[in-house]
């Protein structure tokens, strides 16, 4: 069993029990901090250059990204991300009607990557992405319904025993591709298509039973856009408190997404972000409907300082209304296309640390850190004196000190261990090197004097000293 978890002052839940918490989506989203999207990877399609019959999983790297690894997700978790969207294109990976059987190789690979995310103790969002069969035209509706039901039944069965840390997202940006209404908020034809598909998706997952009866589900507006037409004609299912609205917002457009005339590299006006958040709040949040912004971002224009300010502003606004956000990372850093890369997936180097810093700063007092537990063994040094002495940091968090220096598991910074099946704090005497404050790699100083810390977050790892956030170590 993998022991992977989040420390808090209130609870300690071990992933692996598969017990499904019966909580509303309004409660669930409170535990989501910053999200990261595995863009241009499992959603990549290369029908003209790949022989899908010979190799079903080659498409993962056919748009230029490297094979996804567990270490990538551990790195992201260490940086503060706890929500991981996994965009997935199923076309090319399933058979003909009427079964539309998903290829076993492909399902296995998708399952592996979902586990990479879950293994951090965070949340995974699995979806249906760059499909052509669900373009939102009436002529496609009946065939699209059949495929949607078949694909989601198989996905639901594959992950039937997964708990609330796995979220299903029915569709990605369903819209009338190639039509004048494609990105303009839709029309009656498009709205009806999306509403019927959303309703069918929810009913399909619920009918599979087991944990899926309580599965948290995300459904989009038309094109997942924040537009009066799309939102006013969106139908949210009644009587189901485990459904979340999925929205995308690359705002301000000219700063964040526009790659042509009118594009700007300076962030000086947050009015578009304000409008988006005010709309979300008035249309959904104020009515008790939870929202996740499943995609947002600002492409690289050699303007990292501006993107840092933008990220802090964006996340601060979203956090103020209780909306978690998932940044889009397509793995591209240079060139003429969309440059939304954040982390080098080969070296695990954060290419734009200031941008990450802005995201974390935007969380403000809502910041929560997640600890990824990995199987290691601490080394007893000549200075080690294993005792029952409880004079270590974990006592203040409600956990005893580890009796010895050799424990079954430690977290990534070596501060927490598992001993006799229980979490415990590892004493500083178990290391002959000075402890390095983990917050420095996120751009925050160490707290200099814990007695002067005037505020701590709920897991006691972050503090406020002299008006500034600092890491407690």
Swiss-Prot record:
Rate of hydrolysis of cellulo-oligosaccharides increased with increasing chain length from cellotriose to cellopentaose. It comes from the Eukaryota. Keywords: Glycosidase, Hydrolase, Repeat, Signal. Residues 1-17 form the signal peptide. Residues 391-427, 436-473 form the CBM10 domain. InterPro entries: CBM10/Dockerin_dom (IPR002883), Dockerin_dom_fun_sf (IPR009034), Glyco_hydro_5 (IPR001547), Glyco_hydro_5_CS (IPR018087), Glycoside_hydrolase_SF (IPR017853), Glycosyl_hydrolase_5 (IPR050386). Residues 365-387 are annotated as: Linker. The gene is CELB. It catalyses: Endohydrolysis of (1->4)-beta-D-glucosidic linkages in cellulose, lichenin and cereal beta-D-glucans. Pfam families: CBM_10 (PF02013), Cellulase (PF00150). One of its GO terms (biological process) is glucan catabolic process. The active site is at residues 173, 295. GO terms for cellular component: cell surface; extracellular region. This is Endoglucanase B. Belongs to the glycosyl hydrolase 5 (cellulase A) family. Residues 18-367 are annotated as: Catalytic. GO terms for molecular function: beta-glucosidase activity; cellulase activity. Its EC number is 3.2.1.4.
